[in-house]
Every structure is written in C-alpha cells, then in structure tokens.
C-alpha cells in the first residue's frame, strides 16, 4: 500500500539573500511507515538527499525515538518542530558509502 500526504517544507530562497520559503511537498507512506524526503548537509558542506522517518524502520528510529515527545508540534497541521540529529556510522545512505 502506497499513499501520499501533502505537507509543506521549509526551503532556501531563490538566492542567498532572500528569506526561506515554504514549498509544498509530499510525505510518502509505504505499509504504514512514513518517509519524508529531506536534504542532509554533511560536515564538509555537501548536500545529499535522504529519506527520514521517526516511526521506525531502517532510518532514524533508534536515534529519534525520544524526540517527538520532547519536541513541540502544531496540532492543526500535525507538524513536528525541532532539531533532529542522527549519528550515522557511514558517510550517507545508511552505509551505502564508505566513510571519508
């Protein structure tokens, strides 16, 4: 089963000096596990695409399990507000790349 929910995500402005903007995006739900497509910035500044979840599965559960309870949320939108940190033992993509 695959469903999509429309959400808004904060995106950088068109140029460096413009304010950030919210863009419509979709949250993909596959078999009851929600994934949000995000961009992760690595320590060197490189940005890579990443699928993030806080519901379990292969990404983020062991690191983010306590964050939803400690964070704030907007009940009218269901949005979780906070800074999410995750320690990855490899470079990116859940071990698909060798650490630098």
Swiss-Prot record:
Organism encoding this protein: Populus euphratica
Keyword Thylakoid carried by entry: yes
Organism taxonomic ancestry: Eukaryota, Viridiplantae, Streptophyta, Embryophyta, Tracheophyta
Origin superkingdom: Eukaryota
Region of interest (Disordered), ranges: 1-23
Annotated family: Belongs to the PsbO family.
Its job: Stabilizes the manganese cluster which is the primary site of water splitting.
One BP annotation, GO: photosystem II assembly
Protein name in UniProt: Oxygen-evolving enhancer protein 1, chloroplastic
Molecular function via GO: oxygen evolving activity
């Amino acid at each position: 089963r695959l469903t999509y929910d429309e959400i808004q995500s904060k995106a950088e402005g068109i140029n460096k000096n413009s304010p950030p903007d919210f863009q419509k995006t979709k949250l993909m739900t596959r078999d009851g596990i929600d994934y949000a497509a995000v961009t992760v910035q690595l320590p060197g500044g490189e940005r890579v695409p990443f699928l993030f979840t806080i519901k379990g599965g292969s990404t983020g559960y062991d690191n983010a399990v306590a964050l939803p309870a400690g964070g704030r949320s907007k009940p009218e939108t269901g949005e979780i507000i906070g800074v999410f940190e995750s320690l990855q033992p490899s470079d990116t993509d859940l071990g698909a790349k060798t650490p630098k």
